[in-house]
């Protein structure tokens, strides 16, 4: 059986944790930041866990993660 290919777009966006979950970046922190509070920007800088409903889709795109 041939090797499965990893979706490179997904590999750049998600990171697998030791427990099998995936981490992602938060949205709304690329530009237009001057009106956002420092507290909000700090929060947006942290990683978030991919929702349980999307975990299977991300796992299919990254078979060796």
Swiss-Prot record:
Name of the encoding gene: rpmI
GO biological process, one term: translation
Cellular component GO terms, alphabetical: cytosolic large ribosomal subunit
Alphabetically ordered keywords of this record: Ribonucleoprotein, Ribosomal protein
Stored NCBIfam families: rpmI_bact (TIGR00001)
Protein name, as recorded: Large ribosomal subunit protein bL35
Gene3D superfamilies, A to Z: 4.10.410.60
InterPro entries linked to this entry: Ribosomal_bL35, Ribosomal_bL35-like, Ribosomal_bL35_CS, Ribosomal_bL35_sf
PROSITE patterns: RIBOSOMAL_L35
Domain of life: Bacteria
Family membership noted in the UniProt record: Belongs to the bacterial ribosomal protein bL35 family.
Gene Ontology molecular functions: structural constituent of ribosome
Keyword Glycosyltransferase: no
